[in-house]
Curated annotation (Swiss-Prot):
Swiss-Prot/TrEMBL keywords: Amino-acid biosynthesis, Branched-chain amino acid biosynthesis, Magnesium, Metal-binding, NADP, Oxidoreductase, Repeat
Positions contributing to Mg(2+) 2 binding: D217, E389, E393
Binding site for Mg(2+) 1: D217, E221
Domain KARI N-terminal Rossmann span(s) in chain numbering: 15-208
Gene3D superfamilies referenced in this protein's UniProt entry, alphabetically: N-(1-d-carboxylethyl)-l-norvaline Dehydrogenase, domain 2 (1.10.1040.10), NAD(P)-binding Rossmann-like Domain (3.40.50.720)
Protein name in the entry: Ketol-acid reductoisomerase (NADP(+))
A GO cellular-component term linked to this record: cytosol
GO molecular function: ketol-acid reductoisomerase activity; magnesium ion binding
HAMAP family with a match to the protein in the record: IlvC (MF_00435)
GO biological process, one term: isoleucine biosynthetic process
Cofactor note as given: Binds 2 magnesium ions per subunit.
Length: 491
């Protein structure tokens, strides 16, 4: 199989990379009705599989789970989760032939085997659904021409998909139809109904393409969402300890600092995050972020280039074929780092303390978010897609570190994201070591003293922060979410 993106000509590549439209609430007036009375069979019962299934069932759809024979016979975790939640469970042979929509929610590396198993069993004219387009775009999976291929990609972990639905809301979602597989022209109707059934239409849906979703998703998770947080955690911890900070305090400042800092990001973008700092600290954070952007820009561009060309995917798939040797080695090495093995700090750190003593961390967040966004947009990805794959998801990933450090982040994210994270962080840590050696007192671990600032400089920095394109599109999209939540909660 050939990488699908690389089979397209340049005009087709640009058209698919640039496909992104924020859909109006009125486009979902029919809710999930297009799929009501039809049989939806989900393959895989992990975080996305279970939680999407729960939402879809609560939205009135007929949901069952197709699992491998051995998973059922051995009563594995997937079987237990599905049966304990009252779902019908059967083998591929028992359930797939009757399915109107088969939703493949297994890990990326299993997709080819799953499709190879289910495709011969699918009835003529059925639909195949994904929540990530890697198998179609990067692997180049060929699907029977009578089958409609759609994607519904919630921009959150599966647990959040469920919790937001239970609150009467949803999570922002990308939907797409594979242009090579829409024989009856019903792909968009299926995708809209599926998105509505998960609650995504209440938070905002972007009509996208398989290509745009995959390329932007890979870029976000490799750089700012996971790679930058891992590299930043390791670098900042080592710097604090090197300067005499108690390792337990240093660990807590970083572990919970990312979550605290990005909560401000979630509520009001980079502008609010920077506004949490004193004026002298804001000026310093801005200066540090500009230095970081200059240093890291080539690394971000290399990751984007390798994602666009397919170099990243081919390297990762070679590691799949080698029993994940690189992935497992990197995972083990990360678990042995000083940050991961540091003792826990029993004392309390106040919320503002995380900002005051984390100026460098704030600079890293700002630089990483802006660089990821800029690099995606420069590559033809539309701003709304770039926002969701950079700033929007960052607080969710930071929350995983707050639970159990980098271990938890790497457990929760996909193997694809984890592999890309290690590629980035292993390059970024040595790249930034000279920069770390030049830090000033107050950049990390100590607060910058209050003092006079130049009004004109502060004015210009504030303007630069607020006028960045990600702040403009972020304000618009957060406004949509707030408005939609208000409408949804009001009934």
């Amino acid at each position: 199989m050939a990488n699908y993106f690389n089979t397209l000509n340049l005009r087709q590549q640009l058209a698919q990379l640039g496909k992104c439209r924020f859909m109006g609430r009125d486009e979902f007036a029919d809710g999930a009705s297009y799929l009501q009375g039809k049989k939806v069979v989900i393959v895989g019962c992990g975080a996305q599989g279970l939680n999407q299934g729960l939402n879809m069932r609560d939205s009135g759809l007929d949901i069952s789970y197709a699992l491998r024979k051995e998973a059922i016979a051995e009563k594995r975790a997937s079987w237990r989760k599905a049966t304990e939640n009252g779902f019908k469970v059967g083998t591929y042979e028992e359930l797939i032939p009757q399915a109107d929509l088969v939703v493949n929610l297994t890990p990326d590396k299993q997709h080819s085997d799953v499709v190879r198993s289910v495709q011969p069993l699918m009835k003529d004219g059925a639909a195949l659904g994904y929540s990530h387009g890697f198998n179609i775009v990067e692997v180049g999976e060929q699907i029977r021409k009578d089958i409609t291929v759609v994607m519904v990609a919630p921009k959150c972990p599966g647990t959040e998909v469920r919790e937001e639905y239970k609150r009467g809301f949803g999570v922002p979602t990308l939907i797409a139809v594979h242009p090579e597989n829409d024989p009856k022209g019903e792909g968009m109707a299926i995708a809209k109904a599926w998105a509505a059934a998960t609650g995504g239409h209440r938070a905002g849906v972007l009509e996208s393409s398989f290509v745009a979703e995959v390329k932007s998703d890979l870029m976000g998770e490799q750089t700012i969402l996971c790679g930058m947080l891992q590299a930043g955690s390791l670098l900042c911890f080592d710097k604090l300890v090197e300067e005499g900070t108690d390792p337990a305090y240093a660990e807590k400042l970083i572990q919970f600092g990312w979550e605290t800092i990005t909560e401000a990001l979630k509520q009001g973008g980079i502008t609010l995050m920077m506004d949490r700092l004193s004026n002298p600290a804001k000026l310093r954070a801005y200066a540090l972020s500009e230095q970081l952007k200059e240093i890291m820009a080539p690394l971000f561009q290399k990751h984007m280039d390798d994602i666009i060309s397919g170099e990243f995917s081919s390297g990762m798939m070679a590691d799949w074929a080698n029993d994940d040797k690189k992935l497992l080695t990197w995972r083990e090495e990360t678990g042995k780092t000083a940050f991961e093995t540091a003792p826990q700090y029993e004392g309390k750190i106040g919320e503002q303390e995380y900002f005051d003593k984390g100026v460098l961390m704030i600079a890293m967040v700002k630089a990483g978010v802006e660089l990821a966004f800029e690099t995606m947009v420069d590559s033809g990805i539309i701003e709304e897609s770039a926002y969701y794959e950079s700033l929007h998801e960052l607080p969710l990933i930071a929350n995983t570190i707050a639970r159990k450090r980098l271990y938890e982040m790497n457990v929760v994210i996909s193997d694809t994201a984890e592999y890309g994270n290690y590629l980035f962080s292993y390059a970024c840590v040595p790249l930034l070591k000279p920069f770390m050696a030049e830090l000033q007192p107050g950049d990390l671990g100590k607060a910058i003293p209050e003092g006079a600032v130049d009004n004109a400089q502060l004015r210009d920095v504030n303007e630069a922060i607020r006028s960045h394109a990600i702040e403009q599109v972020g304000k618009k999209l957060r406004g949509y979410m707030t408005d939609m939540k208000r409408i949804a909660v009001a009934g």
